[in-house]
């Protein structure tokens, strides 16, 4: 057995520091200088070429059996090995090499053999060595000029420790001693093949715990810390049995105030364990040994004793408190014990996140602080708001407030109540507001106008509407950022104010006295002609004449029953960033015969899809979307002329009983015509270009064919074109000669 000093010297070399890396470890290798016992080279001092192999292994020399059928290759490799301070025994073939191996007096430490040889090949020699009881501990290295994957896999699968590709480099031969070092340490039981620094562990506290630890196989290396040191198949743990010894490893925190006694870190006798230095003590975790912290050490010690006790035995019953734990790496933790002990979880990263310091936990509580700030703002605005009653029942609001969380990560918009210009804020949701610097603010109107949120909206009611407003599950509205009275959208109760948004699809009113709930369509692209509140809705039928007739009746009857001066709309803004404005022709129609008590307005065919700008109430905004019916104020938008026309700077004004005025400017039409003209010019240019290209190609094809035809018709002499006159002369001369011959 070697001492600790030898371990310290061999550890670095075994982990990648080769013999010939700097010509330090092996004196005389490549003409280098001599190395002192501490490992530092002494320059300028020339010594005879010798090696102190006892620093690394318990042998004075390393004998290498070189097997190669080619004489020149064998001589060159032998010279290189001798230059690296190895003792070489050459062999011409596999049979001669096997003879040397059977002679125990040779004490061969390493076999370097060629794969392809006459007679007994290298693979056959490898099989013989692996099947021999004594020779199987000798590391065998195969070498060949054929680096095919099948050959390499075949050699390594049969027991070879390495495969070298010819031509062999000198640095590869300098590092061959590492295989001997690993094999010596794995067989002696004083270390492991991986070269990690090892030491003897303490004796076990009890036989039960040692047996449990002996049967375990810790592989918790989530954070890059090697928890176990697994020996190879041929390792010996010192007790005569060959098995894995990964059960001896423990992860101990450096910052833990509670010292872990040798009894708690118990291991069976005659075993080795690796010393692992943990750089992050709060992240490292062990499957069997719980981690500790700074507080309540006594209480934690009792918990550790219960956790490490006989309940860990396989097959033994557990108490009720820990009955749910299906594996030893799971552990129940109370909320009050989070500061006292670290939870044992499969995912060590999640455990590390839960075990942060209190300062970081407080800093992470951003949502709670936002909720507190919004509560304070709500209280301040409620105190400054004038007294105005809402027609929404308080019970419904309370119930809804209890159901919904204090901080909604949704696009819901707060509601406001009021009549006319005095609209106040009834309640505010603790919703996430976006900053004015957001990229979406560029698509909104100036601050002077009321900004409509983006999203789907429900409908609202008239002044004397006491019915329950419809609830839209798919209605998500964003909260307005303007300081003016916000526009109420997607409300769950009924109120008096007018809800305005931006849309091109629906201009509807809330039923005045009907108690039944009507579901608002959540789809924007509705291709139907029916009313939004008609019981028989067919939003996907492109031609529904029956629905159209019923819609006319419903709209006309709603116009009679509606309060004067009220203009209701259900507006939806398309979420595209580029705004294509749509201009509506608003007409005023007067009523028909009696119909169900629901006020509604309708958009007739063709179905229009567009993007409207923001709308406002009693202000100059974009959107001329509301026409008045003279007396009743119910609107009907009919026959949108073009699917992509523009609304610009429209106004929605409320007058007295006479109704409202719907007006809009045509500045958007000029822009549309300009764009349309540019598009037409572009299309015409493309068509013209394609036509010219077609004609040009056709002309080329015609010219090519005509020239080809002419070339075929022209006479040739020995491949060269000749004139027609020359050919005629030749023909005439040939005729004369034929006549003379006759």
Curated annotation (Swiss-Prot):
Induction note: Expressed with a circadian rhythm showing a broad peak in the middle day under long day (LD) conditions.
Keywords, in A-Z order: Biological rhythms, Flowering, Nucleus, Phytochrome signaling pathway, Transcription, Transcription regulation, Two-component regulatory system
Residues covered by the CCT domain: 682-724
SMART domains: REC
Biased composition regions of type Low complexity, renumbered to the chain: 186-195, 490-502, 618-634, 719-731
Stretches with biased composition (Basic and acidic residues): 299-313, 331-341
Segments of skewed composition (Basic residues): 697-708
Top-level taxon in the UniProt lineage: Eukaryota
Record-annotated Response regulatory domain positions: 63-181
Cross-referenced Pfam families: CCT, Response_reg
Compositionally biased region (Polar residues): 236-248, 318-330, 503-512
Segments of this protein annotated with the region Disordered: 186-249, 290-346, 377-402, 478-517, 533-568, 590-671, 697-742
One GO BP annotation of this record: cytokinin-activated signaling pathway
GO cellular component: nucleus
Compartments, record wording: Nucleus
CDD domains (alphabetical): psREC_PRR
UniProt-listed PROSITE patterns: CCT, RESPONSE_REGULATORY
Biased composition (Gly residues): 656-667
Family, as annotated: Belongs to the ARR-like family.
Function: Probable transcription factor involved in the regulation of flowering time under long day (LD) conditions. Functions as a repressor of flowering. Controls flowering time by negatively regulating the expression of HD3A. Acts downstream of the phytochrome B to repress the expression of EHD1, an activator of the flowering promoter genes HD3A and RFT1. Controls photoperiodic flowering response. Seems to be one of the component of the circadian clock. Expression of several members of the ARR-like family is controlled by circadian rhythm.
Protein name: Two-component response regulator-like PRR37
Organism annotation: Oryza sativa subsp. japonica
Gene that this sequence comes from: PRR37
């Amino acid at each position: 057995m070697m001492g600790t000093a030898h371990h310290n010297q061999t550890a670095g070399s075994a982990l990648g520091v080769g013999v010939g890396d700097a010509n330090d470890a092996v004196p005389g290798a490549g003409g280098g200088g001599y190395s002192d016992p501490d490992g530092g080279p002494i320059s300028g001092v020339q010594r005879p070429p010798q090696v102190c192999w006892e620093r690394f292994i318990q042998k004075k020399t390393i004998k290498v059996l070189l097997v190669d059928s080619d004489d020149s290759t064998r001589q060159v490799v032998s010279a290189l090995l001798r230059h690296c301070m190895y003792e070489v025994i050459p062999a011409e073939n596999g049979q001669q090499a096997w003879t040397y191996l059977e002679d125990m007096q040779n004490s061969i430490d390493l076999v370097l053999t060629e794969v392809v040889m006459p007679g007994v090949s290298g693979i056959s020699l490898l099989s013989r060595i692996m099947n021999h009881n004594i020779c199987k501990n000798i590391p065998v290295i195969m070498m060949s000029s054929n680096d095919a994957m099948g050959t390499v896999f075949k050699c390594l699968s049969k027991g070879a420790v390495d495969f070298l590709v010819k031509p062999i480099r000198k640095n590869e031969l300098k590092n061959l001693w590492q295989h001997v070092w690993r094999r010596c340490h794995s067989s002696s039981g004083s270390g492991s093949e991986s070269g990690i620094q090892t030491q003897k562990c303490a004796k076990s506290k009890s036989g039960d715990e040692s047996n449990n630890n002996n049967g375990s196989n810790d592989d918790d290396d989530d954070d890059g810390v090697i928890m176990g040191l697994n020996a190879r198949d041929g390792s010996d743990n010192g007790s005569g049995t060959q098995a894995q010894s990964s059960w001896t490893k423990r992860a101990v925190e450096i910052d833990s105030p509670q010292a872990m006694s040798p009894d708690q870190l118990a291991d069976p006798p005659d075993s080795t364990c690796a010393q692992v230095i943990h750089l992050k003590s709060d992240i490292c975790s062990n499957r069997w040994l719980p981690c500790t912290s700074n507080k309540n050490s006594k209480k934690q010690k009792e918990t550790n004793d219960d956790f490490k006790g006989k309940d860990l035995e396989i097959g033994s019953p557990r108490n009720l408190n820990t009955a749910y734990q299906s594996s030893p790496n799971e552990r129940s933790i109370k909320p009050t014990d989070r500061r006292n002990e670290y939870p044992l979880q499969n995912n060590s990263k999640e455990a590390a996140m839960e075990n942060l310091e209190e300062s970081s936990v407080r800093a992470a509580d951003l949502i709670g602080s936002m909720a507190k700030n919004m509560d304070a703002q709500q209280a301040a605005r409620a105190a400054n708001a004038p007294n105005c009653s809402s027609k929404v029942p308080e019970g419904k609001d309370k119930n809804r407030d209890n159901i919904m969380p204090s901080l909604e990560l949704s696009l819901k918009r707060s509601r406001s109540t009021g009549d006319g210009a005095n609209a106040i804020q009834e309640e505010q949701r603790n919703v996430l507001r976006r900053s004015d610097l957001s990229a979406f603010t560029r698509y909104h109107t100036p601050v002077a106008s009321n900004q409509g949120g983006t999203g789907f909206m429900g409908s609202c009611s008239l002044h004397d509407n006491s019915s329950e407003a419809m609830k839209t599950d798919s209605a998500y509205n964003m909260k307005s950022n303007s300081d003016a009275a916000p526009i109420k959208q997607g409300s769950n109760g009924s109120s008096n104010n007018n809800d305005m948004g931006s849309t091109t699809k629906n201009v509807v009113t809330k039923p005045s006295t009907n108690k039944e709930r009507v579901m608002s369509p959540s789809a924007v692209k509705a291709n139907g002609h029916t009313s939004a509140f008609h019981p028989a809705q067919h939003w996907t039928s492109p031609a529904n004449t029956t629905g159209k007739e019923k819609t006319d009746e419903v709209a006309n009857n709603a116009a009679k029953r509606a309060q004067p001066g009220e203009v209701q709309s259900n507006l939806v803004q398309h979420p595209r960033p580029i705004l294509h404005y749509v201009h509506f022709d608003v007409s005023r129609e007067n009523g028909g015969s009696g119909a169900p008590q629901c006020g509604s307005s309708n958009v007739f065919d063709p179905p229009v899809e567009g993007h409207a700008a923001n709308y406002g109430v009693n202000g100059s905004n974009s959107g001329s979307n509301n026409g008045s019916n003279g007396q009743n104020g119910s609107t009907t938008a009919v026959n949108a002329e073009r699917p992509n026309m523009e609304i610009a700077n429209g106004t929605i004004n409320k007058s007295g009983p006479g109704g409202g005025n719907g007006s809009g400017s045509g500045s958007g039409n000029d822009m549309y015509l300009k764009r349309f003209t540019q598009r037409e010019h572009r299309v015409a240019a493309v068509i013209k270009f394609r036509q010219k290209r077609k004609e040009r190609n056709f002309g080329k094809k015609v010219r090519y064919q005509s020239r080809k035809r002419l070339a075929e018709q022209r006479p040739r002499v020995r491949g060269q074109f000749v004139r027609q006159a020359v050919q005629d002369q030749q023909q005439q001369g040939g005729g004369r000669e034929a006549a003379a011959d006759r």
